[in-house]
Amino acid sequence: MEHFDASLSTYFKAWLGPRDTRVKGWFLLDNYIPTFICSVIYLLIVWLGPKYMRNKQPFSCRGILVVYNLGLTLLSLYMFCELVTGVWEGKYNFFCQGTRTAGESDMKIIRVLWWYYFSKLIEFMDTFFFILRKNNHQITVLHVYHHASMLNIWWFVMNWVPCGHSYFGATLNSFIHVLMYSYYGLSSVLSMRPYLWWKKYITQGQLLQSVLTIIQTSCGVIWPCTFPLGWLYFQIGYMISLIALFTNFYIQSYNKKGASRRKDHLKDHQNGSKAAVNGHTNSFSPLENNVKPRKLRKD
């Protein structure tokens, strides 16, 4: 295993250049194998979990879901606030920011982005809860692709470009996750569900996040600095793939639901009209049947 890891490190160095020494020795970052193994285990559970649960009763998980979602809401809020203050203190350039230009502020960003990387491992639990509760319809291609890819992408980001221009997407994503996990946490409480109105806007926010990240990343291509261009091109490509998947998810989830509701409403309206017409027509029948013929006067 050590020989394989050494060979892998040599390959990565030839492909991507030397690693950033500031994260040397950090948990899970020295060696890619643990991240890769976690991802493989995740995909195996996605595949085998629903099969295992097929003939079993779903678990409620309500109590642990409240705690889990509250924890991720607070972690996301912490990361968002720390990234915003770190960028402000380091006077980061929106258009392009190198990885070694802001001193201690760069280190603050790196520490927060490690938590961001680690949170992607924690978020595997999203899928596991879907499986345990038998909500398999929520395990979409978008869901699995996003969860499995983010952990691996951020392992590479943390080892080669752990600050600088890498901050933007993580900052937006942390803010979106504050909204998303607070929604999921509150929806675990049945009495709160009638008051939760912002689910649709979370998906819109995720789409907007991807578009804004492409715009900000493209600025680094148009007005380059010391941040490696290859990472920027990769970021743009990845965001385009997410936009395609999120757009498809949005259309499938909301436009079709809206069309279905309109169709049901029209059907109900037509049925109601027929009932009214039939009622009106039939209402004369008893009256007509009850009319007695007048007797002719016999004067």
UniProtKB/Swiss-Prot annotation:
InterPro entries: ELO_fam, ELOVL5. One of its GO terms (biological process) is long-chain fatty-acyl-CoA biosynthetic process. PANTHER family: ELONGATION OF VERY LONG CHAIN FATTY ACIDS PROTEIN 5, FATTY ACID ACYL TRANSFERASE-RELATED. The chain crosses the membrane at residues 26-46, 64-84, 112-132, 150-170, 172-192, 205-225, 226-246. Its EC number is 2.3.1.199. Belongs to the ELO family. ELOVL5 subfamily. The modification N-acetylmethionine is found at M1. Pfam families: ELO (PF01151). It is found in: Endoplasmic reticulum membrane; Cell projection, Dendrite. It catalyses: a very-long-chain acyl-CoA + malonyl-CoA + H(+) = a very-long-chain 3-oxoacyl-CoA + CO2 + CoA; (6Z,9Z,12Z)-octadecatrienoyl-CoA + malonyl-CoA + H(+) = (8Z,11Z,14Z)-3-oxoeicosatrienoyl-CoA + CO2 + CoA; (9Z,12Z,15Z)-octadecatrienoyl-CoA + malonyl-CoA + H(+) = (11Z,14Z,17Z)-3-oxoeicosatrienoyl-CoA + CO2 + CoA; (9Z)-hexadecenoyl-CoA + malonyl-CoA + H(+) = 3-oxo-(11Z)-octadecenoyl-CoA + CO2 + CoA. Its main location: endoplasmic reticulum. Residues 279-288 have a biased composition (Polar residues). Catalyzes the first and rate-limiting reaction of the four reactions that constitute the long-chain fatty acids elongation cycle. This endoplasmic reticulum-bound enzymatic process allows the addition of 2 carbons to the chain of long- and very long-chain fatty acids (VLCFAs) per cycle. Condensing enzyme that acts specifically toward polyunsaturated acyl-CoA with the higher activity toward C18:3(n-6) acyl-CoA. GO terms for molecular function: fatty acid elongase activity. It is a multi-pass membrane protein. Residues 262-299 are annotated as: Disordered. Interacts with TECR. This is Very long chain fatty acid elongase 5. Pathway: Lipid metabolism; polyunsaturated fatty acid biosynthesis. The modification Phosphoserine is found at S285. Keywords: Acetylation, Cell projection, Endoplasmic reticulum, Fatty acid biosynthesis, Fatty acid metabolism, Lipid biosynthesis, Lipid metabolism, Membrane, Phosphoprotein, Transferase, Transmembrane, Transmembrane helix. The gene is ELOVL5. One of its GO terms (cellular component) is dendritic tree.
